[in-house]
Swiss-Prot record:
Top-level taxonomy: Bacteria, Pseudomonadati, Pseudomonadota, Gammaproteobacteria, Cellvibrionales
Molecular function GO labels: metal ion binding; metallopeptidase activity
Protein name: UPF0758 protein Sde_3678
Keyword entries, A-Z: Hydrolase, Metal-binding, Metalloprotease, Protease, Zinc
Family of the protein in this entry: Belongs to the UPF0758 family.
Length: 224
């Protein structure tokens, strides 16, 4: 049955307008993004099949261009639209963070860092640079690859912080394995960076390790 034959209140677009996006299922939200189905399938039917094919909404959103475009009903145009939506979401979080008078909420910082790093396929080490009022100056990605004491250079971290006149920093990196629990090398490099930054009077407020479903805070663990 075509969606146009459904009761008006059950059609995804009308349901969203009347009840809010939160009231829709993953399949209904995806159907609105798809706009149309394929021969013999409504947009909602196609959306359900795609969610089953990818294993859920998140794997679909994080799929590579090649994997995404191989699925029925998808292609480069939809992939481009999706990437634009995801990037707007990340920029929205960044803008919201910039507007805060100070970054005193670990939850807000976790949400921002997770949006930036959780989807990355390789490890990325980044800095959140803050001024004397703990306001955001800039989010900077510094290193890519295996993050350990041999690949993260304290000199580059200090240089970047000084070049932006940062008074404090929050360290962040992701674990592509999906497990956010910090490793011993994570703890070792945090200590090295904290010591290097102290030499130039720059405070290290936290180190966040991002996994699939959570971000672990060194500060909350009492390690900083």
């Amino acid at each position: 049955m075509a969606i146009t034959d459904w009761p008006i209140e059950e059609r995804p677009r009308e349901k969203l307008l009347n009840r809010g996006a939160h009231a829709l299922s993953d399949a209904e939200l995806l159907a609105i993004f798809l706009r149309t189905g394929v021969k013999g399938k409504s947009a909602v039917d196609l959306a359900r099949e795609l969610l089953a094919y990818f294993g859920g909404l998140r794997p679909l959103l994080e799929a590579s261009q090649q994997d995404f475009c191989q699925a029925q009903g998808l292609g480069n145009a939809k992939f481009s639209q999706l990437q634009a939506v995801l990037e707007m979401s990340r920029r929205h979080l960044a803008a919201a963070l910039e507007q805060k008078t100070s970054l005193t909420s670990t939850t807000a910082v976790k949400q921002f860092v997770s949006a930036q790093l959780r989807h990355r396929q390789s490890e990325v080490f980044a800095l959140i640079l803050l001024n004397t009022q703990n306001q955001l100056i800039k989010f900077v990605e510094l290193f890519n690859g295996t993050i350990d004491s041999a690949s993260v250079y304290p000199r580059e971290v200090v240089k970047t912080a000084l070049s932006h006149n940062a008074a404090a920093v929050i360290l962040a990196h992701n674990h592509p394995s999906g497990i956010a629990e910090p490793s011993e090398p994570d703890k070792a490099i945090t200590k090295r960076l904290q010591q290097a930054l102290q030499l130039v009077d720059i405070r290290t407020l936290d180190h966040l390790v991002v996994g699939d479903t959570e971000a672990v805070s060194f500060a909350e663990r009492g390690w900083i």
